[in-house]
Amino acid sequence: MHSLEKVTFEDVAIDFTQEEWDMMDTSKRKLYRDVMLENISHLVSLGYQISKSYIILQLEQGKELWREGRVFLQDQNPDRESALKKKHMISMHPIIRKDASTSMTMENSLILEDPFEYNDSGEDCTHSSTITQCLLTHSGKKPCVSKQCGKSLRNLLSPKPRKQIHTKGKSYQCNLCEKAYTNCFYLRRHKMTHTGERPYACHLCGKAFTQCSHLRRHEKTHTGERPYKCHQCGKAFIQSFNLRRHERTHLGQKCYECDKSGKAFSQSSGFRGNKIIHIGEKPHACLLCGKAFSLSSDLR
Protein backbone atom coordinates (compact mmCIF):
# COMPACT_ATOMS: atom_id res chain seq x y z
CA MET A 1 0.00 0.00 0.00
CA HIS A 2 1.28 3.47 -0.79
CA SER A 3 2.15 5.79 2.06
CA LEU A 4 -0.78 7.98 3.00
CA GLU A 5 0.13 11.61 2.68
CA LYS A 6 -1.51 14.78 3.92
CA VAL A 7 -4.72 15.59 2.03
CA THR A 8 -6.68 18.83 1.66
CA PHE A 9 -9.99 19.80 0.08
CA GLU A 10 -8.15 21.60 -2.69
CA ASP A 11 -6.32 18.50 -3.97
CA VAL A 12 -9.40 16.98 -5.63
CA ALA A 13 -12.57 19.03 -5.70
CA ILE A 14 -15.87 18.99 -7.53
CA ASP A 15 -17.45 22.37 -6.95
CA PHE A 16 -20.86 23.97 -6.75
CA THR A 17 -21.39 27.52 -7.87
CA GLN A 18 -23.32 30.01 -5.77
CA GLU A 19 -26.42 29.57 -7.93
CA GLU A 20 -26.39 25.79 -7.45
CA TRP A 21 -25.87 26.18 -3.70
CA ASP A 22 -28.79 28.61 -3.50
CA MET A 23 -31.05 26.03 -5.18
CA MET A 24 -30.38 23.47 -2.44
CA ASP A 25 -32.87 23.39 0.42
CA THR A 26 -31.95 23.05 4.09
CA SER A 27 -32.16 19.25 4.08
CA LYS A 28 -29.79 19.01 1.10
CA ARG A 29 -27.28 21.33 2.75
CA LYS A 30 -27.45 19.31 5.98
CA LEU A 31 -26.99 16.12 3.95
CA TYR A 32 -23.92 17.68 2.32
CA ARG A 33 -22.37 18.48 5.71
CA ASP A 34 -23.08 14.99 7.07
CA VAL A 35 -21.72 13.26 3.96
CA MET A 36 -18.55 15.36 3.86
CA LEU A 37 -17.80 14.83 7.55
CA GLU A 38 -18.47 11.10 7.22
CA ASN A 39 -16.01 10.87 4.34
CA ILE A 40 -13.45 12.74 6.43
CA SER A 41 -14.01 10.24 9.26
CA HIS A 42 -13.48 7.33 6.85
CA LEU A 43 -10.19 8.76 5.65
CA VAL A 44 -8.94 9.35 9.18
CA SER A 45 -9.76 5.73 10.05
CA LEU A 46 -7.72 4.62 7.01
CA GLY A 47 -4.68 6.53 8.20
CA TYR A 48 -4.89 9.71 6.13
CA GLN A 49 -3.73 12.97 7.64
CA ILE A 50 -6.56 15.43 7.11
CA SER A 51 -5.66 19.09 6.91
CA LYS A 52 -8.32 21.08 8.77
CA SER A 53 -9.09 23.74 6.24
CA TYR A 54 -11.49 26.64 6.79
CA ILE A 55 -14.28 24.70 5.06
CA ILE A 56 -13.87 21.65 7.33
CA LEU A 57 -14.05 23.89 10.40
CA GLN A 58 -17.21 25.49 9.00
CA LEU A 59 -18.69 22.03 8.42
CA GLU A 60 -18.00 20.87 11.96
CA GLN A 61 -19.63 23.99 13.37
CA GLY A 62 -22.68 23.56 11.11
CA LYS A 63 -22.25 27.07 9.69
CA GLU A 64 -23.47 28.43 6.37
CA LEU A 65 -20.76 27.85 3.79
CA TRP A 66 -21.73 30.45 1.22
CA ARG A 67 -21.33 34.04 2.34
CA GLU A 68 -19.45 35.68 -0.53
CA GLY A 69 -19.28 35.81 -4.31
CA ARG A 70 -22.80 37.07 -4.98
CA VAL A 71 -21.70 40.44 -6.40
CA PHE A 72 -18.20 39.54 -7.56
CA LEU A 73 -19.40 36.95 -10.05
CA GLN A 74 -21.08 39.68 -12.08
CA ASP A 75 -17.74 41.39 -12.83
CA GLN A 76 -17.34 42.37 -16.48
CA ASN A 77 -13.68 41.28 -16.67
CA PRO A 78 -13.71 37.60 -17.84
CA ASP A 79 -10.33 36.78 -16.24
CA ARG A 80 -11.27 38.37 -12.93
CA GLU A 81 -14.70 36.73 -13.05
CA SER A 82 -13.14 33.31 -13.62
CA ALA A 83 -10.64 33.78 -10.79
CA LEU A 84 -13.25 35.00 -8.34
CA LYS A 85 -15.68 32.27 -9.30
CA LYS A 86 -13.00 29.66 -8.65
CA LYS A 87 -12.11 31.32 -5.36
CA HIS A 88 -15.69 31.24 -4.10
CA MET A 89 -16.55 27.72 -5.21
CA ILE A 90 -17.61 25.23 -2.56
CA SER A 91 -15.70 21.95 -2.37
CA MET A 92 -18.21 19.11 -2.62
CA HIS A 93 -15.90 16.10 -2.91
CA PRO A 94 -14.57 13.35 -0.62
CA ILE A 95 -10.90 13.95 0.19
CA ILE A 96 -9.16 10.99 -1.46
CA ARG A 97 -5.72 10.61 -3.00
CA LYS A 98 -5.37 9.32 -6.55
CA ASP A 99 -2.53 6.99 -5.52
CA ALA A 100 -4.44 5.30 -2.72
CA SER A 101 -4.88 1.54 -2.84
CA THR A 102 -7.89 0.52 -4.91
CA SER A 103 -8.25 -2.64 -2.85
CA MET A 104 -9.52 -0.67 0.13
CA THR A 105 -13.17 -1.23 0.93
CA MET A 106 -15.36 1.36 2.57
CA GLU A 107 -18.53 -0.26 3.82
CA ASN A 108 -19.89 3.04 5.04
CA SER A 109 -19.35 4.86 1.73
CA LEU A 110 -22.25 6.21 -0.28
CA ILE A 111 -23.46 3.57 -2.75
CA LEU A 112 -24.42 4.53 -6.29
CA GLU A 113 -27.35 2.40 -7.39
CA ASP A 114 -27.74 4.09 -10.77
CA PRO A 115 -25.31 3.26 -13.63
CA PHE A 116 -22.91 6.16 -14.18
CA GLU A 117 -19.97 6.31 -16.52
CA TYR A 118 -16.79 7.87 -15.26
CA ASN A 119 -15.18 10.21 -17.78
CA ASP A 120 -11.54 9.37 -17.08
CA SER A 121 -11.64 5.75 -18.22
CA GLY A 122 -15.21 5.01 -19.27
CA GLU A 123 -15.66 2.52 -16.42
CA ASP A 124 -19.13 1.88 -15.11
CA CYS A 125 -19.90 3.01 -11.57
CA THR A 126 -22.82 0.67 -10.88
CA HIS A 127 -24.57 -0.27 -7.64
CA SER A 128 -21.66 -2.45 -6.55
CA SER A 129 -19.31 0.53 -6.50
CA THR A 130 -19.14 3.56 -4.28
CA ILE A 131 -18.41 7.19 -4.95
CA THR A 132 -15.24 7.05 -2.92
CA GLN A 133 -14.03 3.73 -4.36
CA CYS A 134 -14.47 5.01 -7.91
CA LEU A 135 -12.61 8.22 -7.15
CA LEU A 136 -9.64 6.29 -5.74
CA THR A 137 -8.54 5.58 -9.32
CA HIS A 138 -9.35 8.99 -10.80
CA SER A 139 -8.33 12.56 -10.22
CA GLY A 140 -11.81 13.66 -9.21
CA LYS A 141 -11.77 16.62 -11.58
CA LYS A 142 -14.35 15.23 -14.01
CA PRO A 143 -17.90 14.48 -12.89
CA CYS A 144 -19.82 11.25 -13.46
CA VAL A 145 -22.23 11.28 -16.40
CA SER A 146 -25.62 9.60 -16.39
CA LYS A 147 -25.95 7.08 -19.22
CA GLN A 148 -29.69 7.70 -19.42
CA CYS A 149 -29.65 11.42 -20.13
CA GLY A 150 -25.99 12.31 -20.65
CA LYS A 151 -26.05 15.03 -17.99
CA SER A 152 -23.33 15.29 -15.36
CA LEU A 153 -23.98 14.17 -11.82
CA ARG A 154 -21.74 16.33 -9.63
CA ASN A 155 -22.83 14.34 -6.60
CA LEU A 156 -25.93 13.20 -4.72
CA LEU A 157 -26.60 16.73 -3.52
CA SER A 158 -27.60 18.22 -6.86
CA PRO A 159 -30.88 20.17 -6.58
CA LYS A 160 -32.66 17.38 -8.51
CA PRO A 161 -30.78 14.05 -8.35
CA ARG A 162 -30.64 12.41 -11.79
CA LYS A 163 -31.79 9.06 -10.40
CA GLN A 164 -34.98 10.59 -9.04
CA ILE A 165 -35.65 12.40 -12.33
CA HIS A 166 -35.41 9.16 -14.33
CA THR A 167 -37.52 7.01 -12.00
CA LYS A 168 -39.91 9.66 -10.63
CA GLY A 169 -40.14 7.88 -7.29
CA LYS A 170 -38.43 6.44 -4.25
CA SER A 171 -35.74 4.33 -5.86
CA TYR A 172 -33.85 3.01 -2.84
CA GLN A 173 -35.73 0.27 -1.00
CA CYS A 174 -34.77 -1.60 2.16
CA ASN A 175 -34.67 -5.36 1.51
CA LEU A 176 -35.62 -6.09 5.13
CA CYS A 177 -38.73 -3.97 5.66
CA GLU A 178 -39.35 -2.61 2.12
CA LYS A 179 -39.30 0.99 3.31
CA ALA A 180 -38.25 3.21 0.39
CA TYR A 181 -36.20 6.38 0.12
CA THR A 182 -35.35 8.90 -2.58
CA ASN A 183 -31.68 8.95 -1.59
CA CYS A 184 -29.28 6.06 -0.96
CA PHE A 185 -27.71 7.98 1.94
CA TYR A 186 -31.01 7.85 3.84
CA LEU A 187 -31.40 4.15 3.00
CA ARG A 188 -27.96 3.33 4.37
CA ARG A 189 -28.72 5.28 7.53
CA HIS A 190 -32.07 3.47 7.88
CA LYS A 191 -30.40 0.05 7.57
CA MET A 192 -28.46 0.79 10.74
CA THR A 193 -31.75 0.50 12.65
CA HIS A 194 -31.89 -3.16 11.56
CA THR A 195 -28.23 -4.02 12.12
CA GLY A 196 -27.77 -2.02 15.31
CA GLU A 197 -24.62 -0.49 13.85
CA ARG A 198 -23.39 2.64 15.65
CA PRO A 199 -20.08 3.61 14.05
CA TYR A 200 -19.63 7.00 15.74
CA ALA A 201 -18.49 6.66 19.37
CA CYS A 202 -17.81 9.41 21.89
CA HIS A 203 -14.16 9.28 23.04
CA LEU A 204 -15.15 10.63 26.46
CA CYS A 205 -18.00 8.35 27.56
CA GLY A 206 -18.09 5.65 24.86
CA LYS A 207 -21.70 6.30 23.85
CA ALA A 208 -22.18 5.45 20.17
CA PHE A 209 -24.42 6.90 17.47
CA THR A 210 -25.59 6.06 13.96
CA GLN A 211 -24.82 9.54 12.60
CA CYS A 212 -21.77 11.74 13.02
CA SER A 213 -24.05 14.77 13.44
CA HIS A 214 -25.61 13.09 16.49
CA LEU A 215 -22.15 12.46 17.92
CA ARG A 216 -21.16 16.12 17.47
CA ARG A 217 -24.38 17.18 19.17
CA HIS A 218 -23.73 14.76 22.05
CA GLU A 219 -20.15 16.00 22.52
CA LYS A 220 -21.53 19.46 23.30
CA THR A 221 -23.14 18.01 26.45
CA HIS A 222 -19.62 17.29 27.73
CA THR A 223 -18.21 20.70 26.84
CA GLY A 224 -21.28 22.65 27.97
CA GLU A 225 -21.34 24.47 24.65
CA ARG A 226 -24.69 26.08 23.82
CA PRO A 227 -24.16 28.05 20.62
CA TYR A 228 -27.82 28.78 19.83
CA LYS A 229 -29.10 31.69 21.91
CA CYS A 230 -32.56 33.26 22.00
CA HIS A 231 -32.26 36.97 21.26
CA GLN A 232 -35.38 37.72 23.32
CA CYS A 233 -34.69 36.04 26.66
CA GLY A 234 -31.05 34.96 26.35
CA LYS A 235 -31.73 31.26 26.92
CA ALA A 236 -29.18 29.10 25.08
CA PHE A 237 -29.49 25.67 23.47
CA ILE A 238 -27.25 22.91 22.15
CA GLN A 239 -29.34 22.40 19.00
CA SER A 240 -30.75 24.95 16.58
CA PHE A 241 -33.96 22.89 16.46
CA ASN A 242 -34.51 23.43 20.19
CA LEU A 243 -33.96 27.16 19.76
CA ARG A 244 -36.57 27.35 16.98
CA ARG A 245 -39.01 25.39 19.11
CA HIS A 246 -38.34 27.70 22.06
CA GLU A 247 -38.86 30.81 19.92
CA ARG A 248 -42.39 29.63 19.16
CA THR A 249 -43.25 30.09 22.84
CA HIS A 250 -42.48 33.79 22.45
CA LEU A 251 -44.51 34.08 19.26
CA GLY A 252 -47.40 31.92 20.44
CA GLN A 253 -47.14 29.80 17.30
CA LYS A 254 -48.86 26.43 17.22
CA CYS A 255 -47.82 24.75 13.99
CA TYR A 256 -49.27 21.28 14.62
CA GLU A 257 -53.05 21.01 14.42
CA CYS A 258 -55.09 17.84 14.95
CA ASP A 259 -57.51 17.25 12.07
CA LYS A 260 -59.94 15.42 14.37
CA SER A 261 -60.24 17.67 17.39
CA GLY A 262 -58.83 20.90 15.98
CA LYS A 263 -56.46 21.17 18.94
CA ALA A 264 -53.16 22.87 18.09
CA PHE A 265 -49.69 22.30 19.48
CA SER A 266 -46.42 24.20 19.36
CA GLN A 267 -44.36 21.00 19.47
CA SER A 268 -44.60 17.87 17.35
CA SER A 269 -44.26 15.65 20.44
CA GLY A 270 -47.49 17.03 21.89
CA PHE A 271 -49.22 16.58 18.55
CA ARG A 272 -48.11 12.94 18.30
CA GLY A 273 -49.26 12.28 21.86
CA ASN A 274 -52.69 13.71 21.05
CA LYS A 275 -52.93 11.56 17.93
CA ILE A 276 -52.16 8.40 19.92
CA ILE A 277 -55.02 9.23 22.29
CA HIS A 278 -57.46 9.46 19.36
CA ILE A 279 -56.52 6.09 17.87
CA GLY A 280 -56.47 4.39 21.26
CA GLU A 281 -52.90 3.17 20.97
CA LYS A 282 -51.12 2.41 24.27
CA PRO A 283 -47.47 1.74 23.46
CA HIS A 284 -46.06 2.35 26.95
CA ALA A 285 -46.51 -0.71 29.19
CA CYS A 286 -45.49 -1.15 32.82
CA LEU A 287 -42.93 -3.95 33.24
CA LEU A 288 -44.28 -4.81 36.71
CA CYS A 289 -48.05 -5.00 36.24
CA GLY A 290 -48.45 -4.91 32.46
CA LYS A 291 -50.77 -1.90 32.46
CA ALA A 292 -50.37 0.17 29.29
CA PHE A 293 -50.62 3.90 28.68
CA SER A 294 -50.88 6.20 25.69
CA LEU A 295 -48.24 8.64 26.96
CA SER A 296 -44.86 7.89 28.49
CA SER A 297 -45.50 10.62 31.07
CA ASP A 298 -48.51 8.63 32.34
CA LEU A 299 -46.34 5.52 32.68
CA ARG A 300 -43.81 7.39 34.80
Curated annotation (Swiss-Prot):
CDD domains: KRAB_A-box (cd07765)
Cellular component per GO, a single term: nucleus
Any one GO MF annotation of this record: RNA polymerase II transcription regulatory region sequence-specific DNA binding
Gene Ontology biological process terms, A to Z: regulation of transcription by RNA polymerase II
Protein's UniProt keywords contain Kinase: no
SUPFAM superfamilies attached to this UniProt entry: beta-beta-alpha zinc fingers, KRAB domain (Kruppel-associated box)
UniProtKB keywords: DNA-binding, Metal-binding, Nucleus, Repeat, Transcription, Transcription regulation, Zinc, Zinc-finger
Domain KRAB: 7-78
Superkingdom of the organism of origin: Eukaryota
Ranges annotated as C2H2-type zinc finger: 172-194, 200-222, 228-250, 256-278
Main location: nucleus
Compartmental location: Nucleus
Keyword presence, Calcium: no
Gene3D superfamilies tied to this protein: 6.10.140.140, Classic Zinc Finger
Coiled coil ranges: none
One Pfam family from the record: zf-C2H2
Family that this chain belongs to: Belongs to the krueppel C2H2-type zinc-finger protein family.
Function, as annotated: May be involved in transcriptional regulation.
Protein name (record): Zinc finger protein 705D
Organism: Homo sapiens
